[in-house]
């Protein structure tokens, strides 16, 4: 590699440092890539979500909705792993300036424990967001043990989700490769997960009950030094039974139906 005028010296030194870090990390034949940030650390992302929803209720014709949303996400680390949990505040902003805030908790093993909404408008304003869009590092979080390229692991997390309560997040992950991207030593992880959905939403006209499951395949590139996500992409497919329940006191019968949801998303670090 030439160190001539074709590339600024600081960039070359940064690249060499990343290669050295990757070499040290893999010196024993493996690497640890658990999410372990310092309190106060902030990460900025652009999140693009494209969703297609097909809904059929009662004897009505099926309705199709197609939507693409671009969000700006700010992740701020509130509590370090040394205190027991890693707690991260996730703020998602629409182009119009609307903000929804989540708090994400990870346990001592850096596995997802809970995602909670603490403020902001209802979920409908932000489209069909899932774990991969809110906090991509948790979509197939590796174990804290030393991993080698090609290693696999099981995902089996009991967690709390917004508007739902307890759920079991299951699947499998795989460390695809180790590389250097934009001067950072990174690990690429692929995962396939399934999340059950059992949600009841109160409306003025009654209640909406949603039951089913959502399967997601994702690829995540994480910084080896602290586990932060550099970029991610995911494909989700969900099939749900839908029930529209009348308000208390009404003699109207419930309306049952079915909803099929497909979501494609990308997450890119910009700061």
Each model region followed by its residue ranges:
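Bacterial N-terminal signal peptides that target proteins for export
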Residues: 1-16
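Bacterial N-terminal signal peptides
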Residues: 13-25
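Short, structured beta-strand/loop micro-motifs enriched in basic residues and often containing a Trp
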Residues: 26-28, 128-139
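Acidic, serine/threonine-rich low-complexity disordered tracts
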Residues: 26-108, 155-271
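Short, surface-exposed secondary-structure edge patches
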Residues: 33-34, 142-145
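Short acidic, low-complexity segments enriched in Ser/Thr/Gly/Pro
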Residues: 108-134
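Short coil-to-beta transition motif at edge beta-strands of beta-rich domains
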Residues: 148-156
